Regions:
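Beta-strand residues in well-ordered beta-sheet regions across diverse protein folds
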Residues: 91, 136, 169-172
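Positively charged n-region of N-terminal signal peptides that target proteins for export
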Residues: 1-4
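A solvent-exposed, acidic/Ser-Thr-rich amphipathic alpha-helical stretch
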Residues: 77-133
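Short, low-complexity N-terminal intrinsically disordered segments enriched in polar/charged residues
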Residues: 19-78, 82, 86, 189-191
Length: 191
């Protein structure tokens, strides 16, 4: 549990990119002091991340992993009810709460396509504790001040599963408002 809370705290910090340094901002890929960012290490075998000595935690990880591949990436909104409660709570400021609202919003951006065996997004880790599953991703984005420059950052999605149904009941991520673009930063690099 301690590992989860530390990673969640670090994740929120990593996703907020607002450091200013004397003399200007360092280029993408560097810390505020000008040191190179540590390279992100993605999982070589995403399915290995689903393992747990606790069968409930393994099931929770698999449900979130399958939801992501089938519904979010695959665009199969007709299957959302298999994975999400009707009362799904959304903490992303760009999507309303409720399964139907998720389907309407995300479905517009993700037409159905073949479901991949693993996530098309590069996963760093999947961590589960109690009814919470957190997925850590590597993600490319353009620098806000220098759009021609691209850097890699971490992204975190946290899901709470309903104790009775075992389905996704709540979601958090570190998203800001998407603005006039109508899509998240880095969406052009989404697989």
């Amino acid at each position: 549990m301690r590992r989860f809370h530390i990673l969640l705290l670090l994740g929120c910090s990593a996703a907020i990119f607002a450091a200013e340094v004397p003399g200007g901002r360092p280029p993408p890929g560097f810390t505020p002091s000008g040191k190179p960012l540590a390279p992100l290490v993605v999982a070589a075998d995403q399915r290995a991340l689903l393992a747990s000595s606790d069968p409930k935690l393994a099931r929770n990880k698999k449900l979130v992993f399958d939801f992501w591949r089938i519904v979010y990436e695959g665009g199969h909104m007709e299957r959302a009810a298999e994975f999400m409660t009707p009362e799904y709570i959304q903490h992303n400021p760009n999507v309303e709460s409720g399964r139907e609202a998720f389907v309407n919003t995300i479905g517009k951006a993700r037409p159905p396509r073949e479901v991949a065996a693993v996530s098309r997004f590069p996963i760093i880790d999947i961590i589960a504790e109690r009814d919470i599953v957190m997925v850590m991703w590597a993600r490319k984005v353009r620098d806000r001040e220098h759009p021609e420059q691209i850097y890699e950052m971490t992204w975190f999605d946290v899901f709470r599963l309903d104790a009775k149904s075992g389905k996704i009941a709540e979601h958090w991520d570190s998203s800001e408002r998407w603005g006039s673009a109508g899509r998240p930063p880095g969406a052009e690099f989404f697989p």
